[in-house]
């Protein structure tokens, strides 16, 4: 007797999504890690440091999921060139006076987008 699998996406579509999630988590950990030395405010440095760890854990878990979906685990892929360009622009916030822009770009733009994508995936 066979049982239908739960979910609406094919294995390939799920692998692409997971690859996108991994890519963004990896980019976030690198971006936040790079900003720690550039950010003068100690509370913001500590926040970035904690979230570097969280992003690393998430990227690792997504990477472990990829082989289960018959996809290469060594790296993720951006969902689109436009989104990759947006993340590159955010990564470019390197000036010392851009701490507020850094916080807003990650916690009001990228993280909410990631949460919405995760919620859609689970629905």
Where are these regions (language model features)?
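Intrinsic structural disorder
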Residues: 19-27, 31, 41, 61-67
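Conserved alpha-helical segments that form or flank metal/cofactor-binding pockets of metalloenzymes
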Residues: 46-90
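A structural signal for long alpha-helical coiled-coils and helix-turn connectors
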Residues: 33-37, 63, 70, 91-94, ...
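Acidic/His metal-coordination segments adjacent to aromatic residues that form catalytic metal sites
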Residues: 2-19, 78-109
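Generic structural signal for well-ordered secondary structure
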Residues: 11-14, 25, 41, 48, ...
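Helix-loop segments that flank and shape redox-cofactor active sites
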Residues: 27-50, 114-123
């Amino acid at each position: 007797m066979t049982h239908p699998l739960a979910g609406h996406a094919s294995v390939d579509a799920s692998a692409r999504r997971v690859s996108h999630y991994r890519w963004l988590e990896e980019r976030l950990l690198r971006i936040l890690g790079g900003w720690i030395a550039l950010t003068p405010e100690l509370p913001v440095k500590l926040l970035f440091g904690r979230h570097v760890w969280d992003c690393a854990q998430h990227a690792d878990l997504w990477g472990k999921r990829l082989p289960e979906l018959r996809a290469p685990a060594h790296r993720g892929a951006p969902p689109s060139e436009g989104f990759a360009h947006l993340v590159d622009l955010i990564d470019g916030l390197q000036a010392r006076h851009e701490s507020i822009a850094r916080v807003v770009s990650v916690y009001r733009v990228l993280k909410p987008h990631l949460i919405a994508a995760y919620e859609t995936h689970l629905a």
